[in-house]
Amino acid sequence: MRMMVAGGGTGGHVFPGIALAEEVVTRHPANDVVFVGTARGLEASVVPAAGFPIELIEVKGLKGKGIAGALLNLLLLPRAFLQSWRILRRWRPDVVVGVGGYASGPVVLTAWAMRIPTAVQEQNAIAGLTNRLLGRVVKAAFTAFPEAARHFAARKVYQLGNPIRRRLMENYMRPESAHGQPRLLVFGGSQGAHALNMRVIEALPHLADLRERIQITHQTGARDREYVEKGYRACGFTPDVREFIDDMSAAYAGCDLVVCRAGATTLAELTVCKKPSILVPFPAAADNHQVKNARSLVDAGAAVMIEERDLTGEVLAREIREILDAPERRERMARAAGRLGSPQAAKEIADVCMELVRRRWGSPFGQAREPGQKPARPPDPAS
């Protein structure tokens, strides 16, 4: 089976796509996956680093661009559809999965017009504009939150959760090593989160009596690392401050409480790894979807949410202290998080995709082609 994964822009779209791709290629040596994205998106660097080929098209968003910007970006759409058609004709995928983001629209619509089975994977509680539009034509809509189902026809919805990377799955399967001091993990996504970084530093004076009793790992992003490190040391803390955490599996395994944003991929990781959390939703997220995401964990008893407008150093310190000082509460939160986890999401989504392929092509392995057969000529980036 050859799968095409279309979309990206942010890690929230890209990483679930990579997790699904990892599942597909491990099933059979003849399976392969190709991605389609844009040169400006995170996928342009992350997908090749994960070992998958990627094609690039030229397309930009329409939402929030103003009338002039939207009209200008509309002019790019015919070219994006032509590029999509060329890529699809060259790679001949058996199924196309849109993961959200600008690139998914032209590719999935063109695949539908070519009678290739299509699906979308919606990571958030509020479906993005592209996925809502594509939901009218695709065969399946994979959702992670019950709230997202209302955007799609009931017969198309598979609520299976968000796929997470295989390295995180290894952490899920690995027993946690015992450690003495409570451990706090702070991060704001792959680029850090400036407001979150600042509030954590403001919280430190209110946690001064704990500085000998807790260990802190803090991913800051490049912009704030030096300032944050100085802030910790000024308050007598000796944390592990990093611009970027390469091995999130180890970071999750070694912590008792997480302070972070409420992106869908992050929440999928927290629940599979069974970690209590304090969630600070990104206020500029489209349709305020991070607040909706966070509420699902809060309502289940797995997390505490502090909206950024209410976030002060004192408030954050109080929540950190109350959770770290209550092992029984942490354990209850961890169990609640685990009940929300979907460790089999990638496997179950791949199962449905293979069934779509079987219905269309008569075999779960798709169209007849030689094993490993690639396009007859090298792909032309953004041609």
From Swiss-Prot:
What GO molecular function annotations does the UniProt record carry, in alphabetical order? UDP-N-acetyl-D-glucosamine:N-acetylmuramoyl-L-alanyl-D-glutamyl-meso-2,6-diaminopimelyl-D-alanyl-D-alanine-diphosphoundecaprenol 4-beta-N-acetylglucosaminlytransferase activity; undecaprenyldiphospho-muramoylpentapeptide beta-N-acetylglucosaminyltransferase activity
Which NCBIfam families does the record cross-reference, listed alphabetically?
A: murG (TIGR01133)
Classify the source by domain of life: Bacteria
What is the membrane topology listed in the Swiss-Prot or TrEMBL record?
Answer: Peripheral membrane protein
- Gene name, please? murG
Provide the E.C. number(s) assigned to this enzyme. 2.4.1.227
- Chaperone: present as a keyword of the record? no
Lineage per the UniProt record:
Bacteria, Pseudomonadati, Myxococcota, Myxococcia, Myxococcales
Protein name according to UniProt? UDP-N-acetylglucosamine--N-acetylmuramyl-(pentapeptide) pyrophosphoryl-undecaprenol N-acetylglucosamine transferase
